[in-house]
Amino acid sequence: MTDPELERIRRKKIMELQRKLEESQEKKVEEEREKKALEEAQRRAMLRRILTPEARERLARVRLARPQLAQAVENYLLQLAQTGQLKEKIDEDQLKRILKQVSDATRKEYRIRFKRK
């Protein structure tokens, strides 16, 4: 084989390997996206079972204003449900109490100090 022919074969092989690598990376990203979507759907279904419609609505409004708080409350509620500590659906008043508890537990305290000269 001549040098130009070897170089052409090498380039072709490199291009093929790069294409395969890109395809596998795209496939991994797509699988991860599907996995996250499935997990989120399962979370929503579980929350639908343990919250009344009014409580779900309130949690949705909280999610708009304070996403981290809503996420923490959802995790707490799902944990309670998975351990069997919930005997009935959570209504809006119970959710308010839970929101306050979680908010108080996760709230950061800020101090403002003035330096006077």
From Swiss-Prot:
Which HAMAP family does this entry report, sorted A to Z?
dsDNA_bind
Pfam families, per database record: dsDNA_bind
The record ties this protein, via SUPFAM superfamilies, to: Double-stranded DNA-binding domain
Q: What is the protein's name according to its record?
A: DNA-binding protein MK1619
Q: Which residues span the membrane?
A: none
UniProt keyword annotations, A-Z: DNA-binding
Top-level taxon of the source organism:
Archaea
Protein family per UniProt: Belongs to the PDCD5 family.
Gene Ontology cellular component? cytosol
DNA-binding as a keyword? yes
- What molecular function terms (GO) are annotated for this protein? DNA binding
**InterPro entries recorded:** DNA_bind_arc, PDCD5-like, PDCD5-like_sf
